[in-house]
């Protein structure tokens, strides 16, 4: 009997990480008027071409069928499962997973399935899933594996910078007037995820300065709490992400992971966005 991990596609983990840590993944979807895609099945390049042509799509949580399928695959062979998902304030995935679990437990009475709200997304979620997977690979119990994820959540932060405010405005994530004023004044916000919701971390005049401010915050946190792990996120700006990763490598003496941000998160932020997700050795909160 082993403990397995299930997370969702908004963790933005690349295939190397998924395979290395034996993590199960269920995908959220994006839907235009005439077609739908699981976000793992469409590249950012194709997605934004379609978005420019067809307008803002809707995002949707994984189906109950998809969730039940993965859960059954795990528990049917006697393994236990920890599910850790995107913040419940951002998606109904966490809520739907409880319905799926109840359905699976009706069929497999002895099944053990725990569900955790990460209160985050992207690699802030991914790092919690990886921490759980490491504990599982060490032979820890389901309760200990869940605790490992919860402990990582106390140590992590995600900062990201949109290239402009157009997509945030289109997606309705900030007020239209705020987006217009921001663009007129050429203000670039640094955004973060705090207690499950997106909030403004800082407002900076240029993207270059915003990136410097973001790196400086990582430096302050890791000087105080130690460096655990770090990832650079980007949307269709790999060269910029690679330069940021090189800066981080030189400054922190660690090799950051580089991960795309997929369509479900990306439709609210837009191409050109760049960010850093990281966790520390000691608790930040």
Curated annotation (Swiss-Prot):
Pfam families in the cross-refs: DegV (PF02645)
Alphabetized Gene3D superfamilies for the sequence: 3.30.1180.10, 3.40.50.10170
Alphabetically ordered keywords of this record: Lipid-binding
Domain DegV: 3-280
Residues involved in hexadecanoate binding: 59, 91
UniProt-recorded Gene Ontology molecular function terms: lipid binding
Described function: May bind long-chain fatty acids, such as palmitate, and may play a role in lipid transport or fatty acid metabolism.
NCBIfam families in UniProt: DegV (TIGR00762)
Name of the protein this chain belongs to: DegV domain-containing protein CA_C3284
Source species: Clostridium acetobutylicum (strain ATCC 824 / DSM 792 / JCM 1419 / IAM 19013 / LMG 5710 / NBRC 13948 / NRRL B-527 / VKM B-1787 / 2291 / W)
